[in-house]
Amino acid sequence: MTKLIEPKKYTKTLDLLRSFFLSRGFLEVHTQNRLSILAACEDPETVATYEYNGEVWPLPQTGQMWLEYELLKNPEVPGFFCLSTSYRQEPNPVAGRHEVIFPMFEFEMHGGVEALEEMEKDLVAHL
């Protein structure tokens, strides 16, 4: 069973994450309504499926590919972020390490590893 997230903590955390990225010119992308086979995050063996409109689709694990798509399509934007629900059909979930359904906040930006490291340092300080 997936552990419930306390709403006040959830709201506070999302407000902090959103305000950080919006203040840097990032745009939020809704990725969950995009039917796609680009669903796997790490291990394609953990992808669950669902039937929708007569077709079988993978339940999304990540919005990463859609964030990268938006970044390539809109190079003038500094970056993009999303909040999505990740579904992982872990065969042997480890308590305290694996949740099979959980919210995930992701971002993609222009730049190399150094720019990413600076962004992450700033994000940690903001939180």
Segments from the language model and where they lie:
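Short, conserved charged micro-motifs
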Residues: 113-118
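Metal-assisted phosphate- and nucleotidyl-transfer catalytic regions
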Residues: 119-127
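Class II aminoacyl-tRNA synthetase-like tRNA-binding/catalytic domains
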Residues: 1-110
